[in-house]
A protein has these predicted regions:
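A glycine- and small-aliphatic-rich helix-loop capping segment at beta-alpha/alpha-beta transitions
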Residues: 25-28, 80-84, 115-123, 153-160, ...
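ATP-binding/phosphotransfer module of carbohydrate and carboxylate kinases, centering on a glycine-rich
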Residues: 2-56, 179-328
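Glycine-rich phosphate-binding loop of actin/hexokinase-like ATP-binding domains
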Residues: 125-126, 132-194, 276-277, 284-289, ...
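Short glycine-aspartate micro-motif
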Residues: 8-12, 62-64, 100, 137-141, ...
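Short beta-strand-loop/turn "lid" adjacent to the catalytic site in phosphate-handling enzymes
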Residues: 53-101, 106-119, 272-277
Length: 328
């Protein structure tokens, strides 16, 4: 990486972690990546100041933050942590010429054309090839919440499509899913897709599948549920994980239909990346392809797991450099 005299600061801020790094004009990629816990800082401003102090960098020229929240008039209020970010306030504090907030999955969408074969794992039998001309992609991924976005290229222009589709209502497709929904409605006024496909979502499913025999329910966190499913020590954990992946597939399939993303759907998120083999042998593709009259179309859409360490930072770095280029 070149001089840090006027660096470009990028960040990928989720409900739990904030990852910061630097990029530079004319460079590719990023450097000086550090992960911070959101709970350790009163605000994003404080976390950024701590990051810059740790690496000994000067105030950034451009700041681009990918945030796990809807961005409205360059302001972000998180649903899964206490931070409130206003772009203008960041610009004033750090004397940055430009600050831009983008949705975290919009940032991941920007990374999709930049990923190498080594960054991807094919899920299903349909081979993926990066189109040479126009394309439409979708990306989805569970973490603290559930993110979704799209990326469209038409000619020499690329358009990201951020959204909050994961807060749409959950639509069960099997009798067992109907029963899970009915159980969860006793806990939540409204059951969104994110209530089932996220870190908390797998715990909700695990609780719901115990409602035929509540006395057997033992509270487990998401990591414990996945571990028990892998070693087969808990049949309810196996059931919960099966449902988790099938429902993820259903929602990913809905995303593909909504965007007409026939060129590919990408799966991101820290949860899934920890269990690639579990995903590969799960009912994900069954849920993805089960679209009635559109089943034959769905069978032709490739699905891939993103293995890159931080596609959010990769996409944010690309976006930030484009932003800096326009500024100059």
């Amino acid at each position: 990486m070149t001089s840090q005299e006027h660096p470009i600061l990028i960040g990928d801020i989720g409900g739990t972690n904030a990852r910061f790094a630097l990029t530079a004009h004319g460079e590719s990629g990023y450097s000086n990546g550090i992960n911070l816990k959101c709970a350790d800082y009163e605000s994003a401003d404080d976390a950024i100041a701590n990051y810059l102090a740790q690496i000994g960098a000067s105030s950034p020229d451009v700041i681009c933050l990918a945030v796990a929240a809807p961005v409205i008039e360059q302001t972000a209020d998180f649903t899964n942590n206490h931070w409130h970010i206003v772009a203008d306030e960041l610009a004033n504090r750090f004397e940055a010429h430009q600050v831009r907030l983008i949705n975290d999955f919009e940032a991941i969408a920007h990374s999709l054309p930049l990923l190498d074969d080594a960054d991807l794992m094919l899920i299903g039998e349909r081979k993926f090839e990066l189109p040479n001309d126009d394309f439409t992609f979708g990306v989805i991924g569970p973490g603290t919440g559930l993110g979704q976005a799209g990326l469209i290229r038409r000619g020499d222009q690329v358009f990201p499509i951020p959204g909050e589709a994961s807060h749409a209502g959950f639509a069960p497709e099997t009798q067992q899913q109907i029963e899970i929904l009915q159980s969860l409605r006793t806990r939540f006024e409204r059951v969104s897709e994110e209530r089932l496909v996220s870190g908390a979502g797998i715990e909700n499913i695990y609780w719901a599948v115990h409602q035929d025999d509540p006395a057997r329910h033992s509270k487990k966190n998401s990591a414990e549920i996945f571990a028990a499913a892998i070693d087969g020590s808990d049949e309810k954990a196996v059931c919960a994980v099966d449902q988790f992946f099938e429902i993820l597939g259903q929602i990913a399939g809905d995303l593909a239909l909504s965007l007409n993303a026939t060129d590919g759907i990408f799966i991101a998120g820290g949860i899934i990346k920890r269990y690639p083999e579990l995903l590969a042998r799960s009912c994900f593709r069954k849920g993805f392809e089960s679209k009635g009259r559109y089943k034959s179309m769905m069978e032709k859409i490739p699905t891939q797991l993103i293995l890159h360490a931080d596609p959010g930072l990769l996409g944010a770095s690309h976006y930030a450099r484009e932003l800096a280029l326009k500024q100059n």
